[in-house]
A protein has these predicted regions:
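Positively charged, helix-rich recognition surfaces that bind polyanionic ligands
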Residues: 1-183
């Protein structure tokens, strides 16, 4: 999971999130305002309600299409995928200030798609516990140090300076492979 995108992988690739909800927010607000001004029970209100529903469905379809394409790309490319199990619903409710962004990127749906596509292809989908300190462990020397969410660069005493999400991705991959060997 990447807070300002969809994911960061252990190869250094970062997949941004297209933010479909954010892009349609102004138009949605305008349509909802128009809907609120219509008289209840009228044909014009029903038409306005359908316009709002159509835009919401379009936004959801855009997100699903993007997630299907990304999950298919990953499922075709890799034999083993290791992910961190995160509770995105709680992440969006805890007041981190990015609730809409967390829900807009569709990480939970993405993981579900990835899981069934990998299992259909006979590949491995490994879940690493959300309490595993992936961003706090140095991917080079293995030492652990506390960092805050504001720290975007992980700096270790061994001299390693690395993006926090990339460091976490490498650690999640290593832990996932360890879990796979243990199973």
């Amino acid at each position: 999971y990447k807070s300002d995108g969809l994911y960061a992988d252990s190869n250094g690739n970062v997949c941004g999130s297209p933010k479909y909800y954010r892009k349609s927010q102004k138009k949605l607000a305008k349509l909802q305002r128009q809907l609120s001004r219509k008289e209840k029970g009228s044909n014009n209100r029903n038409k306005a309600r359908l316009k709002v529903a159509r835009l919401q469905k379009h936004t959801a379809n855009q997100r699903l299409d993007f997630l299907h394409k990304k999950s298919t790309e990953i499922a075709n490319q890799y034999d083993v995928v290791c992910v961190e199990t995160l509770d995105t619903k709680n992440m969006s409710n805890k007041g981190f200030g990015n609730g809409k962004a967390t829900l807009d990127n569709g990480y939970g749906i993405f993981l579900n798609m990835l899981e069934y596509k990998l299992s259909d292809r006979g590949k491995y989908f490994i879940k690493v516990d959300k309490w595993y300190p992936s961003s706090q462990i140095c991917s080079c020397c293995g030492s652990q140090k506390k960092i805050t969410l504001a720290d975007r660069i992980y700096k270790c005493s061994c001299g390693l300076e690395i993006d926090r999400d990339y460091n976490a991705a490498v650690n999640i991959k290593n832990e996932g492979l360890r879990l796979l060997k243990a199973a």
